[in-house]
Amino acid sequence: MAVQGSQRRLLGSLNSTPTAIPQLGLAANQTGARCLEVSIPDGLFLSLGLVSLVENMLVVATIAKNRNLHSPMYCFICCLALSDLLVSGSNVLETAVILLLEAGALVARAAVLQQVDNVIDVITCSSMLSSLCFLGAIAVDRYISIFYALRYHSIVTLPRARRAIAAIWVASVLFSTLFIAYCDHTAVLLCLVVFFLAVLVLMAVLYVHMLARACQHAQGIARLHKRQRPVHQGFGLKGAVTLTILLGIFFLCWGPFFLHLTLIVLCPEHPTCGCIFKNFNLFLALIICNAIIDPLIYAFHSQELRRTLKEVLTCSW
């Protein structure tokens, strides 16, 4: 699996510039002595990937086991876990192949390695795109459940959810394949960045609107009990903290990766950008960390899911 310098290869040429743009392999005198490069050992990549792999496998198995969890909301959560599982699994596979090649335990022809690398790139890219899509889908689902509560079950039906899920997977595979094929075009990188920003804005708008509605509801209840300010302010503060954590984790884990893509287009040869490019492995590790955090935010808060998880762990099928 191709490694450029100290950086692993992901999504074809993402850790290098497209052929139409000068390479990111900046000399030491270009990047300067002040560059901070965070080294991510292969062992850490494997550890993070395996933790995420096991965690998301448990989520998928738990939802599959309990028929009460086969609602549209849990279908989206299950698909998010599957996407995160593929992100982690592809990186575990790539890291394992790199280590085997470096140790001389695996010998393969360059053409074979190139094909394997392309397949892993497509899997990684499609799972990342689908993960972002399902994060947005979960936000939309929760928004409808709050603002259209009486009509929720007629709007978000299981057949519609399945069609949406199928469309997301097909679109993710299709666009990731096109991306790998045309990764030397800056327009492709810009499309990915715009897509990330669109998902971020969508989630922020929906969750902020949901928080505002929840605060209004709490304020109305407080007025009935003549305890307006303490209850309302306490609820609003708790909701704001929760929202900040949710969106903050999303931005901190995904933002650096898409900043990397943006800088490839804007300043491929600038020394400061070159310093940022050196930390590609760190950005990838943050995405894997997000795959570890997602189940804690979206899945394990459910008592029904936690109860079923205990059954899965005790093998009581």
Curated annotation (Swiss-Prot):
Keywords per UniProt: Cell membrane, G-protein coupled receptor, Glycoprotein, Lipoprotein, Membrane, Palmitate, Receptor, Transducer, Transmembrane, Transmembrane helix
UniProt-listed GO biological process terms: adenylate cyclase-activating G protein-coupled receptor signaling pathway; regulation of metabolic process
Topology class, membrane: Multi-pass membrane protein
Topological domain ranges for the Extracellular compartment: 1-37, 94-118, 184-191, 267-279
Chief place where the protein resides: membrane
Record family assignment: Belongs to the G-protein coupled receptor 1 family.
Quaternary structure annotation from Swiss-Prot or TrEMBL: Interacts with MGRN1, but does not undergo MGRN1-mediated ubiquitination; this interaction competes with GNAS-binding and thus inhibits agonist-induced cAMP production. Interacts with OPN3; the interaction results in a decrease in MC1R-mediated cAMP signaling and ultimately a decrease in melanin production in melanocytes.
SUPFAM superfamilies for this protein: Family A G protein-coupled receptor-like
Organism, as annotated: Pan troglodytes
Protein name stated in the entry: Melanocyte-stimulating hormone receptor
Signal sequence, start to end: none
Lipidation (S-palmitoyl cysteine): C315
One Pfam family matching this protein: 7tm_1
Topological domain ranges for the Cytoplasmic compartment: 64-72, 141-163, 212-240, 301-317
Localisation per UniProt entry: Cell membrane
Entry function: Receptor for MSH (alpha, beta and gamma) and ACTH. The activity of this receptor is mediated by G proteins which activate adenylate cyclase. Mediates melanogenesis, the production of eumelanin (black/brown) and phaeomelanin (red/yellow), via regulation of cAMP signaling in melanocytes.
Single Gene Ontology MF annotation: melanocyte-stimulating hormone receptor activity
